[in-house]
Amino acid sequence: MSIMRRILCLAVVIFIINDVSSQGLGNNKNWKKNGMSLSSPGNKKPTGNNAVPQKSKMNNMNQNSLSQPKRSSPPGNSMYNMANQGPMGMMGGFGMGMNNKQMREFMIARRTHGVSPFLKKKICHMAKVAPPVNGQMPSPPQLYAQGFKIRRIGKWFSQDLDWSEGVAMCHNKEMEHRGCEKTPSSKWGRMFPGMGGMGGMGGMGGMMMGNRPMASCDVTKPNSCGNPALMKCSKYHKDRFGMPVCCATSEMTANQLENMGF
């Protein structure tokens, strides 16, 4: 019994010491808040055996607070959250709600100038249009008839101009497909800002088509946009005057023109 009593008393003493030391640290914090430090003449310095442990404990606390960096979000965390929100957050204008795997598939489809079956189905589903048996997009007039507006889908272009325009149908009617040229010169580009697409290909259009007020073209003439390998006359994209406009034939062409500053 005597051993048990000693152990119990020792535990009580340790508890009291810990409680007193914790209160002492709390008082030290209050002293610092009031503008006083432990070393000021008006305060008594801690003496006895508790002085060293208290000082070392506070030093350890300060060192730990200095040595441990502040917690911050991992690099790219905002992009990760944006990616989880779908391309609307990541790319700024898709709004198709694709997850990361679907997004990678979409990017591969862009780089290879191809269209994955998933992308076709996703676009048709987004447009609330049942895809035909052959898996192709409905024609733009059909989408127009259903009241669907045109929207851009980014920088993606197809070698097939009709499919490229079909993709463009899934975005906003006020914004033309990025490859569809509407301002062939910097003069008209300043007068009509934003009409030449994201890259602004007016200068190249002006060199290929001459000094026209707008980049209009004739759908019955294959060469009305200059080099048919670079630009084609669109049957569906029209300027604000109702005239057909020239479109880049591929993403590569559009990117080349954009890199040249147009």
From Swiss-Prot:
Expressing tissues: Expressed in mantle and, after secretion, incorporated into acid-insoluble nacre matrix of the shell (at protein level). Expressed primarily in the mantle with highest level in the mantle pallium and lower level in the mantle edge.
Compositional bias per record (Low complexity), positions renumbered to this chain: 26-35
Signal peptide stretch: 1-22
Region (Disordered) location: 26-84
An example Gene Ontology CC term for this record: extracellular region
Biased amino acid composition, Polar residues: 36-84
Superkingdom of the organism of origin: Eukaryota
Record's keyword terms, sorted: Secreted, Signal
Major subcellular location class: secreted
Location in or out of the cell: Secreted
The protein's name in its UniProt record: Methionine-rich nacre protein
Organism: Pinctada maxima
Lineage, opening ranks: Eukaryota, Metazoa, Spiralia, Lophotrochozoa, Mollusca
